Amino acid sequence: MIKQVVFLKKRADITMEQFKDYYENQHSQLAKRMGAKPSLPNAQRYVRRYITPEKNPLTGEVIHPGYDCIMEIWWNTREDFEAAMKGLGNPEFLQARLEDERKIFATNGNPVCTVEEFDSPVGPNNVVPRWVSSN
């Protein structure tokens, strides 16, 4: 399993509520509206995580990370991820996607990463949570 992570910053002239509303009800559905079936081929999960800066318990400071949302997509294989990235560059859909992103994102130049996850045992029984598959 491979996870793609994208760090997103909203446009300065929209509120966080406007950002969330548009992302959830418009942008996240764009591929489907444009006729892609499925909208994210071979994706296993697609999640948006909206950021609320909190106080650092060591310093007491609230430090904004510079991004408003972390988008994550899980893929079974690197090949699935790469095929999806190639598909996103399809000229038939690229211009519409870029125009839609300009409605909510500060830039189209958002950092895109893949991550390798390791889980540690937690909780009273000191176990790795059951939803975690072994690495």
Which residues fall in each region the model found?
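Macromolecular interaction modules
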Residues: 1-135
